[in-house]
Amino acid sequence: IFPQEISIYEEPLLKRASASAPFDSDGVATRAQNFVTDGVLSSYVLDSYSARRLEMQTTGNGGGVRNLRMTHGTLDQEGLLKKMGTGLLVTELMGQGVNTITGDYSRGAAGFWVEGGEIASPVDEITIAGNLKEMFGSIVESGADIDPRGNIQVGSILIEQMSIAGE
């Protein structure tokens, strides 16, 4: 579901991380685990209820994931912009336009237009659209510019292509 160099994993027991917790909201012990390994789905995110419904074991994710991370390259956001050359840097998404059954999405966005690897102009009131599976498969690289303050700790992501509408 992802390129081979991408792995997505959870580290819920990191010291001093804001999302760390020894137990999930169901009282189940949390543990480090891989959800995607070398681009292949290796585990679902399951709380006690969903695990019971699927006749599987809980993964200790009642209340969500904790310190979710993705493998990354060595480039920061500036390096990824240079690698991209010309395209759109999305800095803000608006709305809830994702179909969880088909993976299709259409969301309002804002950001910056990039020319020659440099930010050229601000862009707002645009729409980005596509399919999550196709987008995940077209990831070129994940950046090393990770902000550790949140629950999901992933750097900038360079995607090969995306549909854009607006001026």
PLM regions: where:
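Dual-mode signal for accessory low-complexity, basic/Gly-rich regions
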Residues: 1-167
